[in-house]
């Protein structure tokens, strides 16, 4: 097994536990950087000419019909407590017939003991798309075919997410910042993986140029995971300070900008939308919009900006912690349905053709 995956598994477990606790209780949202979705206003249709009861929220992703254009994004796994979280997320995904991504499966490759925390997902969500997940540093180091098979078989995965987390690794106390050779290894991975590969940022966004490189390496779906939601730099900075104290790694003048580093979600969608429009070979690529999604109106705006589905992690984690996961998803779908009614859209295909205008926001 490669050097990266030989890291003691108890360190990985501690990190994953820290991540959930910090995301639930810490102040780790972007400051001064928003998703950019608030800049848009969806045009009202005073004469909708439809029956609200006839509105259909169903969508497609990778050829699969799903109940709505929403995905429960990758969060956690690989330790005992994660089994309960993942089971509940999977039950919600099955209830609403929406896709689900698991957290990084590196731990499943390091230690057989905690594989059940991932396996529970497919048991609880037998009929919806479920996606495996591994990090870019692990891909750059080289994954064996047997390791890929282990991840996919464990959850009977419909796709493999490769998460791109350079900014997170930079701030992580035990981070791996060696991304050299990643694109070549990604091309090798996509060639030998029997399911589609999804490239996903974790909160700093994917530009059109990065999307082009990823697509050319064989990626079929881009999850932009733009800035405006959870800053994983802030999550890791909390862990760093707890371990080493308030030791200065970066100049005070730069630290705030680095903690809030990233491309807003809306900007990512705009850029990749232009890439697809101007280059026919990229048009089949599907887009997942995540990074700061807070409501069904945000979901609607991402659909109008070219996404196939929107996805959320942090907001839904908090909803689960509050015992309101199903209620929150239900409200978001009601939000989306309201927008569709007020734009005269019976389907998502019709919604995609509606207009948005840029608001004049105060400076």
UniProtKB/Swiss-Prot annotation:
Keywords: Cytoplasm, Flavoprotein, FMN, Isomerase, Isoprene biosynthesis, Magnesium, Metal-binding, NADP. FMN binds at residues 73-76, 104, 133, 200, 230, 313-314. InterPro entries: Aldolase_TIM, FMN-dep_DH, IPdP_isomerase. Its EC number is 5.3.3.2. It comes from the Bacteria. Transmembrane segments: none annotated. The keyword Chaperone does not apply. Its main location: cytoplasm. Its cofactor is FMN; NADPH; Mg(2+). Substrate binds at residues 15-16, 104-106, 168. PANTHER family: ISOPENTENYL-DIPHOSPHATE DELTA-ISOMERASE. Homooctamer. Dimer of tetramers. Belongs to the IPP isomerase type 2 family. This is Isopentenyl-diphosphate delta-isomerase. It comes from Chlorobium phaeobacteroides (strain DSM 266 / SMG 266 / 2430). The gene is fni.
């Amino acid at each position: 097994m490669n050097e990266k995956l030989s890291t003691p598994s108890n360190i990985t477990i501690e990190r994953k536990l820290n991540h959930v606790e910090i995301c639930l209780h810490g102040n780790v949202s972007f400051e001064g950087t928003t998703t950019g979705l608030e800049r848009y206003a969806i045009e009202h249709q005073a004469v909708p000419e439809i029956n609200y009861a006839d509105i259909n929220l169903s969508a497609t992703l990778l050829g699969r019909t799903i109940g709505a254009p929403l995905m429960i994004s990758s969060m956690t796994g690989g330790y005992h407590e994660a089994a309960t979280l993942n089971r509940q997320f999977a039950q919600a995904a099955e209830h609403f017939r929406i896709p689900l991504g698991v957290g990084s499966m590196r731990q499943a490759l390091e230690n057989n003991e905690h594989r059940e925390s991932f396996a529970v997902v497919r048991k609880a969500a037998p009929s919806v798309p479920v996606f495996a997940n591994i990090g870019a540093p692990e891909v750059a180091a080289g994954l064996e075919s047997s390791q890929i098979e282990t991840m996919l078989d464990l959850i009977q995965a419909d796709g493999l997410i490769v998460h791109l987390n350079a900014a997170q690794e930079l701030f992580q106390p035990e981070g791996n910042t060696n991304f050299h050779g990643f694109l070549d290894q990604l091309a090798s991975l996509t060639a030998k993986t029997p399911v589609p590969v999804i490239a996903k940022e974790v909160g700093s966004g994917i530009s059109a140029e990065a999307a082009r490189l990823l697509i050319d390496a064989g990626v079929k779906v881009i999850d932009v995971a733009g800035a405006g939601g959870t800053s994983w730099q802030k999550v890791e900075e909390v862990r760093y300070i707890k371990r080493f104290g308030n030791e200065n790694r970066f100049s005070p003048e730069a630290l705030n900008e680095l903690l809030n580093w990233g491309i807003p979600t809306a900007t990512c969608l705009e850029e990749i939308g232009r890439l697809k429009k101007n280059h026919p070979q990229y048009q089949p690529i599907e887009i997942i919009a995540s990074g700061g999604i807070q409501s069904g109106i945000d979901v609607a705006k991402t659909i109008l900006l070219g996404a196939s589905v929107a996805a959320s992690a942090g907001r839904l984690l908090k909803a689960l912690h509050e015992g309101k996961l199903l209620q929150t998803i239900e409200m978001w779908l009601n939000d989306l349905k309201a927008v569709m009614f007020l734009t005269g859209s019976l389907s998502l295909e019709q919604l995609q053709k509606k207009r948005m205008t840029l608001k004049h926001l105060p400076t």
